Design a protein with these regions (language model features):
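Ser/Thr-rich, Pro/Gly/Ala-heavy low-complexity intrinsically disordered linkers and tails
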Residues: 10-64
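An edge-strand/N-cap motif at the start of beta-rich repeat modules
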Residues: 58-87
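Repeated scaffold domains used in trafficking and secretory/extracellular systems
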Residues: 60, 101-114, 150-164, 202-214, ...
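Conserved beta-propeller blade signature
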Residues: 68-71, 79, 118-122, 166-176, ...
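Short loop/turn segments immediately following the C-termini of beta-strands
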Residues: 73-74, 83, 124-126, 164, ...
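Structural motif
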Residues: 75-82, 127-135, 181-189, 226-235, ...
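Short loop/turn segments that connect beta-strands within beta-propeller blades
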Residues: 83-86, 135-140, 191-195, 237-241, ...
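Beta-propeller fold detector
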Residues: 88-101, 142-150, 196-205, 242-251, ...
Length: 315
């Protein structure tokens, strides 16, 4: 995910230390993350309390926790999100914990989670390059990696694991980004064993990514240019970055401030805040916008889901 407001502020006045408490990870997440600025609160719909990884491992090798969406609020709260695909107002947020990755001035920017329920969380400070941490989805413990930011021009990026073939347990971490948020962007892969980036192709716009167990890569392209580019979702060719199957989101028009994106049950959930307001969750099918949810006081800067998530609607 990206958080445009914080970036614009840094360019205008310069960024010092922020009083941000970073949210812990729970369950397994796909794409998302994002920059949180100061202030804001959690709250919103759904239950509170703390949660763990939860559930045993099924025949697909996935825990129950690996099948939920996870979100990060600008105040650092990490929560699970169980969508109700029949009535979105019955969807439940459950707050899990706080991240404490000792990333200096950098803030959560994007995240993905592998099928082993390990979260890969990117931090970015708008000045240097990204840092990458591995986060336990059971207790939010952070472990720094040796990832070197800035490879192939990817100073910042959104990311999402994608199954290598439909139903496969093998997966690849795709990334999309570039030098600055909202600027020219490229599609690439990040090898989680060597922590090296390989460029795949160019992207139109600067999307947040989500992957699926169907071996598909999708992007949410927010409106970053005062309505000159309509907010939309597109399927992205994993070999070139080309878009297809574009789904327009007219009601999501307007300058985006914070956005995140996740696939679940054959459908999509866009977490979008305009200016510094609360996040609205847009429930989207391939036919277009289905319904939406007001999250109350949540200002979500990241969301994601693993390739273990269901690929057909489950209610």
């Amino acid at each position: 995910m990206r958080h445009l407001g914080a970036i614009l502020l840094c360019f205008a006045v310069g960024c010092g230390a922020t009083n941000v408490s970073h949210g812990g990870t729970g369950g397994t997440g796909g794409t998302g993350g994002g920059k949180g600025d100061t202030g804001g609160g959690s709250g919103g719909t759904g239950g509170g309390g703390t949660g763990g990884s939860g559930g045993g491992t099924g025949t697909d090798g996935c825990s129950d926790a690996a099948k939920l969406i996870y979100t990060i609020d600008q105040d650092g709260t990490f929560s699970s999100f169980k969508p109700d695909q029949t009535d979105i107002t019955k969807s439940v947020f459950t707050d899990i914990g706080k991240l404490n990755c000792n990333a200096g001035l950098a803030q959560p920017f994007s995240m993905s989670v592998d099928r082993n329920a390990t979260a890969w969380v990117e931090y970015f400070d708008q000045v240097t390059t990204s840092k990458l941490f591995k986060v336990s989805t059971a207790n939010a413990a952070c472990t720094a990696t040796t990832f070197m930011g800035g490879q192939q021009g990817f100073n910042e990026f959104g990311m999402g694991f994608v199954s290598n073939a439909a139903g496969s347990t093998d997966e690849t971490l795709f990334i999309g980004g570039g030098g600055t948020v909202g600027g020219a962007s490229n599609l690439g892969t990040l090898d989680i064993n060597t922590l090296t980036i390989a460029k795949v192709g160019s992207l139109t716009g600067d999307p947040e990514l989500t992957g699926t167990g169907l071996a598909e890569l999708w992007g949410f392209f927010p409106d970053l240019t005062a309505n000159t580019m309509q907010a939309h979702i597109s399927k992205i060719d994993k070999t070139s970055g080309a878009e297809s199957m574009q789904i327009s989101l007219g009601s999501a028009a307007g300058m985006a401030n914070a956005w995140a994106f996740a696939f679940y049950g054959g459908e999509f959930f866009v977490f979008l805040a305009k200016s510094n307001g609360a996040t609205t969750v847009y429930h989207v099918t391939t036919a277009g916008l289905k319904d939406q949810l007001d999250t109350g006081s949540r200002h979500i800067v990241g969301a994601g889901v693993s390739t273990c998530a269901p690929t057909t609607p489950i209610g």
